[in-house]
Amino acid sequence: MSRIRIVFAFLCQLGILPASAAPAIDPAELEAFVDGVVHTTMRQNNIVGATVAITQKDQVILLKGYGFADKEKQLPVDPESTLFRIGSVSKLFTWTGLMQLREQGKLDLDTDVNEYLTTLTVPDTFPEPVTLRHLMSHSGGFEDRIVQLFGDEVADMQPYAEILSRELPDRVRAPGTVSTYSNHGVGLAGLVLEEVSGEKWGDYVQQHILDPLQMSSATAFQPVPEELAGQLSQGYAFELGKHVEKPFEYVPLGAAGGMSASALAMTRFARAHLGDGSVDGQRILSGESVALMREPLFDEHESINTWLYGFDNYSRGDTFIYGHSGGTLRFFTEFVLIPEYDISMFVSTNTTMGFRVIGAVLRGVLDRYLPDPMENVEPLPLTDLDKIAGHWSTYRHPVTTPDKIIRALQPVVVQPVSDNELMVAGLAEHPTYWRQVAPLEFKRVDENVSLVFQPDASPPRMLVGSVLRSYYKISWIESTNAQVQLLIVSLLMVLWVLLAWPVQWFKRRPSRLHATHGRAQLAGWLMAVAVMVVVGLSATLDDSMVFGLGTPAKVLLLVTYLVPLLVLVQLVTVARLYGSDVGRGIKFFHSLLVLIGLYLSWLLYYWNFYGPYPW
């Protein structure tokens, strides 16, 4: 979004210039349309409950609940009072609070955050300090961290300083170089808010944002206060053909995702940000701060949406759209603002896979009332394939800890499918197709989204739609495909050793084996046992890691140390085999087993299974 357009929008909100002609939205027709979309997608995806609010020009034109807040008790969703967990939409309240403190002259966005912290110090890994500007744009340079991101009991709700002193992710890149989502970075910003204001984050949000806006059916506290507990929706997963009610998900770093709110409450927060920072005479921000939060804060390329002051940029064509998404394991939320037409949308669901409902509603409403026609651009022949084809990884993953393994679950592959079209697998649930429209720039064939390659960056980078969706190129051996293929071959041989060697041992009897050969077989068999134990325990890892590591995972991390130790023993015994008179075939097989053991040991090292463990 250009700076001129930002100024124009700001003048419109002050009444100095007329706003653009708003799309004609008939509330009854809108309700019928949204009803159809929600009912269909809820049924298709087994969603228990959803809530929707749409406003235009300070008027609520759609406020509706769908399904149940509590299926067992048959309590319907009430859009005025039912609280949904809004996940990362909570971050907007953190940024709003920090902008309030900035207005009061209590902090500056370009000051080293260590200047505001008394309970911990951000390491000086790089010469450039981390600032609030970096944290607001997710460019602080921290690796991602998922273990213990959530909690399953109130005891997990510890002071921010304690959590971050123990779990602050490593700084793995210079600040301001890459925008990659960081919950812990926002938690750090929440700690700055606490230290500067002298109030706990939840108390601050309640007193300085929720109360002034009269958001009575919203809270920043966990667990939800007793007076609101009866209004909280349950969270659900669809497992083995039925809905399963799940416990309350605590978010220890609440500033990054711990709030709960009704659809009606969120319309008041929307009005404050769509207007001049006030609602019904109660001001939470100045008009200048509201306008500033719509400005670009992190920019990469003219065809790629920027990141704003705490907000994501969802702009389509010439229409400036911004907001934020949120998600826990069970709840999914989207909060969207369109200042040019004074429109807001809030959609939230209470069941796993609810993001499909949200996507259908938002796309449907935008396509219906603010269409974004496909640009008719003549595709160019593919060029620089050697620089763009291959394997890519998201920047958003752990780097130094064992939960780095989640990167293997997010493989992205770029490959040509014709003279002017690329297929990219891994960006969405299904492969997407792109046509080149400029050097190193592509447009999706079915949507106005840009993809840009930056092959001269170090490492080469790919941007998809938004600066926050950035990827870097990886080598073949680092790719999920290569590692899975090599792992399967290795495990087949290990499994053969595990099952066949004991049979051979008893069939031939130890006394008839060459002594050195027998020791080599025993060492190889023990290594095979350790490898299969690691594989078996790895299979127990799932999304419950976000609550912390269970006993199987902790045992796994201990057993992994046995693999390289037993490989070393195997290496010594094989070296002795070469000084004996055993056959070449036996020597070759044991040597191959050592190589496989070394590869598996390297693989465990590559994925940080040998530590460090900050948990």
Task: Locate predicted features.
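Bacterial N-terminal signal peptides
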Residues: 5-16
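Sec/Tat signal peptide C-region and signal peptidase I cleavage site
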Residues: 17-21
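Peripheral terminal and inter-domain segments
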Residues: 22, 360-615
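Short, conserved catalytic-motif segment at the N-terminal edge
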Residues: 25-84, 106-108, 115, 123, ...
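Solvent-exposed, non-membrane alpha-helical residues enriched in polar/charged side chains
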Residues: 35, 39-43, 99, 114, ...
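Active-site SXXK
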Residues: 35-38, 58, 85-110, 186-194, ...
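Short, surface-exposed loop or secondary-structure junction motifs
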Residues: 66-70, 124-339, 365
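Short, well-ordered beta-strand elements
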Residues: 324, 334-350, 461-465
